[in-house]
A protein has these predicted regions:
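Beta-strand-rich domains and repeat architectures in extracellular enzymes and scaffolds
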Residues: 64-90, 352-358
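Beta-propeller domain segments
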Residues: 31-56, 117-119, 127-129, 140-167, ...
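Blade-level signature of beta-propeller repeat domains, shared across WD40, Kelch, NHL, RCC1
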Residues: 407-432
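Beta-propeller domains
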Residues: 84-106
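Blade-loop segments of beta-propeller domains
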Residues: 101-124
Length: 432
């Protein structure tokens, strides 16, 4: 490994140690608890607290394939069955089902680690066998700054001391979508490009060849009203100033000609939907071809949304959650508003969802068509049974493992693979 890359890896390992120290006291411990407040009323029956399924899940076994990742975030399968795994500290590694675990792939852009921001998703181009392209989302340091960790106490302190104007222009880093070619020996990224700025959560390839990327609200850490007035924010302001949105681009970074806001010059043309808070999970429903997005609420109010082009999903004026101090959202506590879309399902208290999966495999025929959600705060794999676009049953699996589950994927053989925050890659297969 060249000297410069050795230094970079060493610096990122040092950042790991610094981040662990920075987050040793959970932020949640300083907040109110959703359980201390009455739950919100759903807009329709079955929108929350679905009953257990009539049939419990079949017996399955859980195997630990690897247990040495450093805060993994995402998993993507290569055509040969190997995997790419992203780690929050700026690494992408190759892994395999036999426990192989590579050194970090060289050439990954510098990453800044700030609260929830870091290296996030990694995705394989649908034509990878021909072009070897991969995509990834990450948080880059601002121009002139070195990569590394911004400790939480410093970050939150800087935010709260800032004025309204300063918060709107505060640049703690650059949210980016990157694309690169994976070298033939799988040791380096080549021809690294920045496809898009402003979003950096989940990547999903659409059936029409375009790609969706989800982005979080840049003000989510200090909640509306972030200026202390606790008031509603107008839709034009949300579209101009907030990054809580789903974007749609072509795989080369160009803008599809049928995107919904192309005729509005004040709106970024890649915008597909808006009013999102922190959508860390997204997947295409294989039955309908629609994009489903799972997003974090504030204090309670995590949501499952079906995305409509041009749709407003309510944040920061509408939510089934509360501000972190327990106050109503936007001063009203509204859970519905004319012109905004309702989630098809929500959780209260929150589960802290991340990766999602529509199961289509043959190993678990009982699970076919079910939606699986990686629950971090819930420390469970959550199974949702669907009837069309409605959730009719919910089951929580693996709670006995007491693991923050970060991502869930289906393997080529139909097994289910999970990443946990403490560095494990787990595999679920039927118990015989």
């Amino acid at each position: 490994m060249p000297f410069r890359e050795t230094v970079q890896v060493g610096a990122r390992v040092a950042a790991v140690i610094a981040l662990v120290a920075a987050i040793s006291v959970p932020v949640r411990a300083q907040q109110a608890k959703a359980e201390d407040y009455p739950p919100p009323k759903p807009a329709f029956p079955g929108q929350t607290n679905a009953p257990p399924p009539a049939k419990k899940s079949p017996p399955f076994k859980v195997e630990t394939i690897i247990q040495r990742f450093m805060a993994p975030w995402s998993l993507a399968f290569l055509p040969d069955g190997k995997m790419l795994v992203s780690e929050r500290y700026g690494f992408i590694r190759v892994a395999s089902m036999n426990g192989f675990y590579s050194a970090p792939i060289a050439g990954v852009p510098d990453t800044k680690i700030v609260a929830a921001e870091s290296l996030h998703d990694v995705a394989i181009d649908p034509d990878f066998a021909k072009n070897r392209l991969i995509y990834f989302t990450y948080f880059a340091p601002p121009p002139g700054e070195d990569p590394g960790v911004w400790p939480l106490d410093v970050f939150y302190g800087d935010v709260w001391k800032a004025s309204v104007a300063e918060r709107r222009t505060m640049r703690i880093g650059e949210e980016r979508v990157g694309r690169a070619r994976l070298s033939e020996d799988e040791k380096r990224l080549e021809n690294v490009q920045v496809l898009l700025d402003g979003v950096n959560r989940r990547i999903v390839f659409a059936p029409d060849g375009t790609m969706f990327i989800t982005g979080a609200d840049r003000f989510r850490f200090y909640e509306p009203g972030y200026d202390g007035t606790n008031h509603e924010i107008t839709d034009p302001d949300i579209l101009r100033n907030f990054t809580g949105r789903v974007v749609r681009i072509n795989r080369d970074g160009s803008i599809p000609k049928d995107n919904p806001f192309l005729d509005q010059p004040t709106v970024l043309p890649e915008t597909y939907s808006y009013g999102h808070r922190d959508p860390e999970g997204a997947a295409i429903n294989p039955t309908t071809g629609k994009l489903w997005v799972i997003e974090h609420g504030p204090l309670g109010g995590d949501e499952v949304n079906i995305i409509k082009p041009g749709g407003n999903y309510g944040w920061p004026n509408v939510s089934y959650g509360r501000r972190y101090n327990g106050d109503p959202i936007a001063g009203t506590g509204a859970t519905a508003k004319e012109g905004t879309e309702q989630p098809i399902y929500f959780w209260y208290p929150d589960i802290a969802p991340c990766g999602v999966l529509f199961y289509t495999g043959e190993l678990f025929p009982e699970w076919k068509g079910n939606l699986f959600v990686a629950g971090m705060y819930a420390r469970s794999l959550i199974r949702l049974v669907l009837d069309g676009d409605r959730v009719v049953a919910e089951e929580r699996l693996l709670h006995d493992l007491n693991q923050r589950i970060r991502d869930v994927r289906q393997g080529p053989e139909g097994a289910i693979y999970l990443l946990t925050d403490d560095g494990k890659l787990l595999r679920l297969t039927p118990k015989k």
